[in-house]
C-alpha cells in the first residue's frame, strides 16, 4: 500500500538562485546561500527574513550552521572560508581554503572540525581549535568534488561525490580513500548516508539523471531510481521518515519510499531548477533550494507513534522498531515535574509496516499499528500478530473487542472479535472516523455519530472536527476543531427513549441526543478525560484541564508534548515528545474527584473527598468553588490568607476578615475592612481599622460625621505629629482653632498661605506673618521680597483693616466654645452673614490676654437667623426646635462606637 504522507508548505522565500540550504537544530531558522554572494536566515514560523550576511560579490555555494558555536560558516567562489557569529553578525574569521571554487562544507557533529571540498579536486580538514589550521588533505578525485557527507553511524568516516563519476569513502587520519564506488555514467553531484541502524546504505544522484542506492559494506548498487528528466542535483535519506528525497534540474522534487523504492509523490512548485535539499533529525521539515528562492515543506505528522495503557506500559515505534517501557519498573524513584523519566527500554521487534500511529484498545490487551495504508493488531504483551488488513483509518470502540476501519472514502466496516460484523456507507461519505462510545464519521457535510450496534444515526452536527475525545462514563465528549473545542453532554436516556418511540427523530438524527455545555476558543493538540475533567495540551504548549467552565493551567511546556495518559494511583499525568522522551506532572486525583463531585452537585461526596486533598492544593479547589458560585464553601476550604480575606469581604464576614487583617498587618486590608465595617454600621470597628491603616482622612470623615469634637481634637494632634498636615489643618479649622492653623502653616513653610489666612481670620497676626514671608523670600529673590506690603505700614492698601481688628476681638469673645450640633438649624449660614455689621458698636471689655488668664471665655452668643430665607422657614424651624429640646447628642448610645477612645494612643 502507498505511504500516506501529508505534505504542507510552511515557507516560500523568493530570492536569487539558492546554492545551499541548512536547518538550525534548535531555532526555527533556515539558512540559504545565494548565487549573488549573500547568505540569508529565514524564520519559517513567522515567515520573516531575520538575518542577512553580505559575504562577497561572487556565488556562495556552501553555508552551514555550527549551532554549538553560534556560527555560520560559508564557502564562496573567491576560495575563502568565512565564519560569522549569527547573533552579532560580526565576521569571526576568514581564510583562503582552496585554489578554486568551494563546493561543499561538512561540519563534524562532535569534533572542532569542518571538511571542505572544491573544484581544485581536494578535500581539506580544518580544526577551529587550532586557529583554523589545515589538519589533513584528501587527494584522489580527478574532477570537481561536488559534495561531502559524514557518516552518522561512524563520525570518522565520510563519503565524497565527484564529477569524475565516482563516489569515494574516506577515513579521518588516512589520506587515501577506503574504497571507490563506480556505476554512474556521468558526473556525481550529490550523496547522502542512510541514518537508520538497519541498512548500510548510501544514495547518490548524477548528471545521468539517475539516483542510485549503494550498500557500502558490500560495495554494490542495490537499486537505481529512474524518473527525473534532467540532471539530479540533490538526493537525501530523510532522518526520520522512511523516504528518499531527490531534486533535479527538471524543477521537480520526488519522494520515494525508502523500503519499497516506489515513487510516492512528485512536487513541482514552479521555481525552476532544484539545487539543494536539507532535513534534520527530530523534525519533519525539509528545506529546498531553487533558482527563484527556497521552500520549506512539512512531511507527515510530527506526533510520535506512541501509546500508554491504564497500567503504565508504554509502546512506541522508533522507525520500524517497536519498543516498550514500563512505568512500574521505576519503583519509588523520586519524580520531578517536567523532568525526563529514566525508563528502561525493551526492544519488542520490528514491524512489517512503517508505524505512523500506535494505539492501545480500552482494556490494554491489544495494540494497533497503522501506516502505509494498512493496520496490524498485536497483543500488547508479546507483540504477536492478531489481525491485519488494509485501511485508510482505524478507530477502537469503547467495547475493547470492537473496532472500525475506513476502507475508502465511502465505506466503513465494523469488526467484533476480529471478525467483520457490519459494513455500511455513510450518507455523505467518510473523510475520517473517530472511536469512543459512538462511532464518529466526518464528511464534507459535517460530523455524524452512529450506534456501534446497528449503525443507526444518532445525531448529525454541522462541524468539522479534528479530534473527538469521550469520557470513560460516556456522558461527556469533547469535539476539537481547528480553532476551538466544544464540550457536549450525551443524553443516553433520551436517545434510548427516542429510539423506542421514534419521537424527536429527524433526518439529522435525535434532536435531544446532545446538550452543549460550553465552547472554548483554544486549539487542542491532544487530550483525555479524567472523571468530568478534560485534560489537554494546547497549541501554545500549555498543559491545561477544563472543568465546569473553568480552565486551570497545570504547566507551561517548553516544547510540544503529547498526552499519553493519567495513572490515578500515582497522581501523575504522563506525556511524551517527538524524541520519545517521557515526562510527567503531578495532578491529584482527589482534586479532580472533588471538582467532579461539585460539578454534579454531589456535595456529600465532595465533603468525603475533601479531607484527602493536601493543604497546598486547597486554594486551587477554593478558586474553583468561587467560580462556581460557592463562595461560602470556598472560604472554608481556602488556605491562602489573601484569597480568604477577599472572600470574607465579599461575604461580609467581619470577624474572619478582622482576624486575617490582624495577621497580615497590611494598611490596604485595614482600609478595605473599614469600608465594609462602615457599610455594616460597625463604626467602632471602622475606627479601629482606620487607626491601624493610619487613614487620617477616613478618621476625620468618621469624626465629623458623628459630631465627635474630642475625636477631631485628638486627630488634629496625631495628624500633625505624623506629618499629615492637610488633615491636621482641617481638624484645627473645624474646631475654630485658627491660631493653631496659622502656626501649622508657618512651621511647614507655607508662608503665603499663612499670610492670606491671617488677613482673612487673624488680622492681628498679619504683620508678623508678612515679616516672616519677606525674610524667607529674600533668600531667593530680594526684589520680590521688598515688594511685599505690610498692612500695618500701608493701611491705605488694605481698607477696613482697623475694623477687622475689632471684628477679630468680637469673634474671640463671642465664639470661644463650639456650639452643640442641635443648634445647627438656628445658626445663620456663613454665606448669609455680615460680620462687620454684627460687630458694630462692640467695645472689648478686656484684652484677650486677660480673658486667657481668667480662663473664663464669654458664653457663645448664637446669631439667630434673620435672613429672608430663614424667615420663610421660621415656622418649621421652631417646630424642629421643639422636637430637639429633649434630644441631646450626648444621649445617643455610642457603646458600640467608642469614637473618642484611644484614637491615637499608639
From Swiss-Prot:
One Gene Ontology cellular component annotation held by this UniProt entry: Golgi membrane
Keyword Acetylation: yes
Residue numbers bearing the Phosphoserine modification: 859
Compartments where located: Cytoplasm, Cytosol; Golgi apparatus membrane; Cytoplasmic vesicle, COPI-coated vesicle membrane
One Pfam family this sequence matches: TPR_COPA_B
Sequence ranges of the WD repeats: 13-52, 55-94, 97-136, 140-180, 183-224, 227-266, 350-388, 390-425, 746-783
GO molecular function, one term: structural molecule activity
Family membership noted in the UniProt record: Belongs to the WD repeat COPB2 family.
UniProt-recorded name of the protein: Coatomer subunit beta'
CDD domains found in the cross-reference section: Coatomer_WDAD_beta-like (cd22947), WD40 (cd00200)
Statement: the UniProt record of this protein carries the keyword Acetylation: yes
Modification type N6-acetyllysine: residues: 627
Protein topology in the membrane: Peripheral membrane protein
Sequence segments annotated as region (Disordered): 837-872
A Gene Ontology BP annotation from the UniProt entry: endoplasmic reticulum to Golgi vesicle-mediated transport
The protein's role, per its UniProt record: The coatomer is a cytosolic protein complex that binds to dilysine motifs and reversibly associates with Golgi non-clathrin-coated vesicles, which further mediate biosynthetic protein transport from the ER, via the Golgi up to the trans Golgi network. Coatomer complex is required for budding from Golgi membranes, and is essential for the retrograde Golgi-to-ER transport of dilysine-tagged proteins.
Phosphothreonine, modified sites: 861
TM stretches of this protein: none
Amino acid at each position: 500500500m502507498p505511504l500516506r504522507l501529508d505534505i504542507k508548505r510552511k515557507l516560500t522565500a523568493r530570492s536569487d538562485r539558492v546554492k545551499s540550504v541548512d536547518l538550525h537544530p534548535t531555532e526555527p531558522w533556515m539558512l540559504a546561500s545565494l548565487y549573488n554572494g549573500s547568505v540569508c536566515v529565514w524564520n519559517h514560523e513567522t515567515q520573516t527574513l531575520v538575518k542577512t550576511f553580505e559575504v562577497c560579490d561572487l556565488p556562495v555555494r556552501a553555508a552551514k550552521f555550527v549551532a554549538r558555536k553560534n556560527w555560520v560558516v560559508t564557502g564562496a567562489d573567491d576560495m575563502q572560508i568565512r565564519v560569522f557569529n549569527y547573533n552579532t553578525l560580526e565576521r569571526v574569521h576568514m581564510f583562503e581554503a582552496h585554489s578554486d571554487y568551494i563546493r561543499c562544507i561538512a561540519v563534524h557533529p562532535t569534533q572542532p572540525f569542518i571538511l571542505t571540498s572544491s573544484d581544485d579536486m581536494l578535500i581539506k580538514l580544518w580544526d577551529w581549535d587550532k586557529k583554523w589550521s589545515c589538519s589533513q588533505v584528501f587527494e584522489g578525485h580527478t574532477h570537481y568534488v561536488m559534495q561531502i557527507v559524514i557518516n552518522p553511524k561512524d563520525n570518522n568516516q565520510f563519503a565524497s561525490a565527484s564529477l569524475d563519476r565516482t563516489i569515494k569513502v574516506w577515513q579521518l587520519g588516512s589520506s587515501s580513500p577506503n574504497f571507490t564506488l563506480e556505476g554512474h555514467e556521468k558526473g556525481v553531484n550529490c550523496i547522502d548516508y542512510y541514518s537508520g541502524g538497519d541498512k548500510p546504505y548510501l544514495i547518490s544522484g548524477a548528471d545521468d539523471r539517475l539516483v542510485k542506492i549503494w550498500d557500502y559494506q558490500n560495495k554494490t548498487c542495490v537499486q537505481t531510481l529512474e524518473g527525473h528528466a534532467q540532471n539530479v542535483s540533490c538526493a537525501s535519506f530523510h532522518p526520520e521518515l522512511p523516504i528518499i528525497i531527490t531534486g533535479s534540474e527538471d524543477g521537480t522534487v520526488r519522494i520515494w519510499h525508502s523500503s519499497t523504492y516506489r515513487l510516492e509523490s512528485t512536487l513541482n512548485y514552479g521555481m525552476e531548477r532544484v539545487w539543494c535539499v536539507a532535513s534534520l533529525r527530530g523534525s519533519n521539515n525539509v528545506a529546498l533550494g531553487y533558482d527563484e528562492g527556497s521552500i520549506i515543506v512539512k512531511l507527515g505528522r510530527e506526533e510520535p507513534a506512541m501509546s500508554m495503557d491504564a497500567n503504565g506500559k508504554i509502546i512506541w515505534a522508533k522507525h520500524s522498531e517497536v519498543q516498550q517501557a514500563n512505568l512500574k519498573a521505576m519503583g519509588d524513584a523520586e519524580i520531578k515535574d517536567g523532568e525526563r523519566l529514566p525508563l528502561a527500554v525493551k526492544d519488542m521487534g520490528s514491524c512489517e509496516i512503517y508505524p505512523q500511529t500506535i494505539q492501545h484498545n480500552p482494556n490494554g490487551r491489544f495494540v494497533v499499528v497503522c501506516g502505509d495504508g494498512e493496520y496490524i493488531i498485536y497483543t500488547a504483551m508479546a507483540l504477536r500478530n492478531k489481525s491485519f488488513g488494509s485501511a485508510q483509518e482505524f478507530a477502537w470502540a469503547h467495547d475493547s473487542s470492537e473496532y472500525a476501519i475506513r476502507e475508502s472514502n465511502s465505506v466503513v466496516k465494523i469488526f467484533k472479535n476480529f471478525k467483520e460484523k457490519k459494513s455500511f456507507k455513510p450518507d455523505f461519505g467518510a473523510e475520517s472516523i473517530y472511536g469512543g462510545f459512538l462511532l464518529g464519521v466526518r464528511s464534507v457535510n459535517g460530523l455524524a455519530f452512529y450506534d456501534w450496534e446497528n449503525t443507526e444515526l444518532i445525531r448529525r452536527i454541522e462541524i468539522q472536527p479534528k479530534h473527538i475525545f469521550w469520557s470513560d462514563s460516556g456522558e461527556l465528549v469533547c469535539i476539537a476543531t481547528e480553532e476551538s473545542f466544544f464540550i457536549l453532554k450525551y443524553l443516553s436516556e433520551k436517545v434510548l427513549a427516542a429510539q423506542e418511540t421514534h419521537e424527536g427523530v429527524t433526518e439529522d438524527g435525535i434532536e435531544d441526543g446532545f446538550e452543549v455545555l460550553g465552547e472554548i476558543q483554544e486549539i487542542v493538540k491532544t487530550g483525555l478525560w479524567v472523571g468530568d475533567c478534560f485534560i489537554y495540551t494546547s497549541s501554545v504548549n500549555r498543559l491545561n484541564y477544563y472543568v465546569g467552565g473553568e480552565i486551570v493551567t497545570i504547566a507551561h511546556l517548553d516544547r510540544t508534548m503529547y498526552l499519553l495518559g493519567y495513572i490515578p494511583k500515582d497522581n501523575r499525568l504522563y506525556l511524551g515528545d517527538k524524541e520519545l522522551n517521557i515526562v510527567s506532572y503531578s495532578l491529584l486525583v482527589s482534586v479532580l474527584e472533588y471538582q467532579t463531585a461539585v460539578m454534579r452537585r454531589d456535595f456529600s461526596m465532595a465533603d468525603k473527598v475533601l479531607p484527602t486533598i493536601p493543604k497546598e492544593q486547597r486554594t486551587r479547589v477554593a478558586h474553583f468553588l468561587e467560580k462556581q458560585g460557592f463562595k461560602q464553601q470556598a472560604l472554608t476550604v481556602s488556605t491562602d490568607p489573601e484569597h480568604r480575606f477577599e472572600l470574607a469581604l465579599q461575604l461580609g464576614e467581619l470577624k474572619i476578615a478582622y482576624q486575617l487583617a490582624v495577621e497580615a498587618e497590611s494598611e490596604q486590608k485595614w482600609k478595605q475592612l473599614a469600608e465594609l465595617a462602615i457599610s455594616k454600621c460597625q463604626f467602632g470597628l471602622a475606627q479601629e481599622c482606620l487607626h491601624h491603616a493610619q487613614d487620617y482622612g477616613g478618621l476625620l470623615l468618621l469624626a465629623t460625621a458623628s459630631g465627635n469634637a474630642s475625636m477631631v481634637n485628638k486627630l488634629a494632634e496625631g495628624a500633625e505629629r505624623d506629618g499629615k498636615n492637610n488633615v491636621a489643618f482641617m481638624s484645627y479649622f473645624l474646631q475654630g482653632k485658627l491660631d493653631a492653623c496659622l502656626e501649622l502653616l508657618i512651621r511647614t513653610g507655607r508662608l503665603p498661605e499663612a499670610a492670606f489666612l491671617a488677613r482673612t481670620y487673624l488680622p492681628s497676626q498679619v504683620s508678623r506673618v508678612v515679616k516672616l514671608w519677606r525674610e524667607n523670600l529674600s533668600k531667593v529673590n530680594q526684589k520680590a521680597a521688598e515688594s511685599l506690603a505690610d498692612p500695618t505700614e500701608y493701611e491705605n492698601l488694605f481698607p477696613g483693616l482697623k475694623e477687622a481688628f475689632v471684628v477679630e476681638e468680637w469673634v474671640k469673645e463671642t465664639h470661644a466654645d463650639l456650639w452643640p450640633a442641635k443648634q445647627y438649624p438656628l445658626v445663620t449660614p456663613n454665606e448669609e452673614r455680615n460680620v462687620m455689621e454684627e460687630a458694630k458698636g462692640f467695645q472689648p471689655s478686656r484684652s484677650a490676654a486677660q480673658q486667657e488668664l481668667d480662663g473664663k471665655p464669654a458664653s457663645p452668643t448664637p446669631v439667630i437667623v434673620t435672613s429672608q430665607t430663614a424667615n420663610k422657614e421660621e415656622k418649621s424651624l421652631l417646630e424642629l426646635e421643639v422636637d430637639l429640646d429633649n434630644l441631646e447628642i450626648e444621649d445617643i448610645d455610642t457603646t458600640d462606637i467608642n469614637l473618642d477612645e484611644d484614637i491615637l494612643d499608639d
